[in-house]
């Protein structure tokens, strides 16, 4: 059974997260990074483009590794390598570009604008003020 946490970003820079479980997550299995899919999977109208992700242990997906396997790759720049000096190469563990059941987080681009969700009213500050008034009396 696949469980995915999907982070969706739109062209304006806004993002949102959705949790997909079991049969809702099945349409994403087997897709590769860079492919587009229908956004109705997450309840939106439009297209989603897969841009990245990571597995349950935090190993990032990399576009140039084919399949869903984990491999040690010699890197000099790119995804999964930060602050490499000039000429330095590092062997790191990376995940392939195919979505499988071991993937936990998937990053996507949405071709339209995400719907604006209003933040719930905060009741906590009001209740704190009431408590302080009760103590003064």
Curated annotation (Swiss-Prot):
Coiled-coil intervals: none
Domain of life: Archaea
GO biological process, alphabetically ordered: translation
Cellular component per GO, a single term: ribonucleoprotein complex
Region (Disordered): 114-137
Keyword annotations: Ribonucleoprotein, Ribosomal protein
Keyword Transmembrane part of the UniProt annotation: no
Transmembrane segments: none
Biased segments, Acidic residues type: 114-127
Molecular-function GO term, any one: structural constituent of ribosome
Start-end of Basic and acidic residues biased regions: 128-137
A Pfam family recorded for this sequence: Ribosomal_S6e
Similarity section: Belongs to the eukaryotic ribosomal protein eS6 family.
Protein name according to UniProt: Small ribosomal subunit protein eS6
